[in-house]
A protein has these predicted regions:
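Non-catalytic terminal/accessory regions
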Residues: 1-222
Length: 222
């Protein structure tokens, strides 16, 4: 029993040490927290994957990374212009094919982590700069999650949209508020929506438009 307790305490201590090291690394790199550093690094990594989205030809079989409108990554396989349901056995040990499969796994994990990070940001009232939100909306894995959430700018709540002229916040009445570069937004908490008398309205919108959220934000018990 004492051995198990010691092992548990040691793991917890190591976990805290890693968290502290990551926080120090983020601060040293000029980020205010670990989440921001992680999102930046993952977005930069996504840029490096651009050729894989265009497709790789392996002995006449085209493999291509795809990300759908909900941020879900998958590996598309086709031969002779026709889609294949599975990867041919001849390519099962091909290094490029294995790398693509591993990349799909990493992108799925990235989506999961992002959902947890955004929920934590809501609970901690983390403020995001407009330039940070622009980068998030440029990331096809993160964008659907951020777009599905309600955001708060001072006393205005709404959904984020990216336009040719910049970010806007569209409120529950359909009014579009342009966001200045120095604006600070946070993920709305149900308390914000209740205070504004808009909680039921956003529930209705999410239900009618079948909007998906990365975590229970609007339909959260409060």
């Amino acid at each position: 029993k004492e051995s198990r307790q010691f092992g548990s305490q040691r793991r917890e201590s190591e976990k805290k040490a890693v968290a502290t090291a990551l926080e120090n690394l983020a601060m040293s790199a000029g980020f205010s927290d670990v989440n921001r550093m992680t999102w930046y690094l993952e977005s930069e990594k996504l840029k490096e994957l651009t050729p894989l989205f265009e497709g790789v030809n392996l002995d006449g079989v085209i493999l291509r990374l795809e990300i759908d409108g909900e941020g879900n990554a998958s590996l598309a396989v086709e031969k002779g212009g026709k889609p294949l349901k599975t990867l041919p056995k001849a390519l099962s040990k091909n290094e490029t094919a294995l790398r693509l499969k591993e990349t799909v796994k990493e992108l799925k994990e990235q989506k999961h982590r992002a959902g947890e990070s955004l929920e934590r940001a809501m609970m901690e009232s983390t403020v995001f700069r407009v330039d940070e939100l622009e980068k998030i909306l440029d990331n096809p894995v993160l964008a659907p999650q951020a777009s599905g959430l309600v955001w708060t700018l001072e006393h205005t709540n709404g959904f984020l949209q990216k336009t040719d002229t910049g970010l806007i916040l569209q409120d529950i009445r359909g009014s579009r508020h342009s966001l200045k570069q120095d604006a600070g937004l946070r993920v709305s908490h149900p308390h914000d929506l209740i205070t504004a008398g808009e909680w039921a309205d956003y529930m209705h919108v999410l239900y009618e438009e079948k909007r998906k959220q990365p975590f229970k934000q609007v339909f959260r018990e409060y």
